[in-house]
Regions:
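Conserved N-terminal substructure of TIR/SEFIR domains
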Residues: 1-61, 70, 79-89, 94-96
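Short glycine-rich anion-binding loops that position phosphate/pyrophosphate groups of nucleotides
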Residues: 63-65
Length: 98
């Protein structure tokens, strides 16, 4: 994957889906839950795989994001990988945060 999209589900309609649509239009290969996960998949195993295989993590930071456990898990994983690999892999996008 080129990018792993980390976001809160409450931000899908207002920001995430339009971003994903544009990335798909550009031919970017992304890990995005609605495109990647299938019924019966192990959520944690698939998220871990996406986090490991993605070149970069796009993190949609919002008030919703900051209050979720799964998004914190994803962000922590990306930070750990960035520190371990000594590589700038996190691309933050501030969404509706002043």
């Amino acid at each position: 994957y080129d990018f792993f999209i980390s976001h809160a589900k409450e931000d899908k309609d207002t920001f995430v889906r339009p971003l994903v649509d544009e990335l798909n239009r550009l031919g970017v290969i992304i890990w995005y839950d609605e495109q990647t996960l299938e019924v019966g998949d192990s959520l944690r195993r698939n998220i871990d795989l996406g986090l490991r295989k993605a070149n970069y993590g796009i993190v949609i930071l919002s008030h919703n994001f900051l209050n979720k456990k799964w998004t914190q898990y994803e962000l922590d994983s990306l930070i750990n990988r960035a520190v371990y690999d000594d590589n700038k892999i996190i691309l933050p996008i501030w969404h509706n945060i002043n």
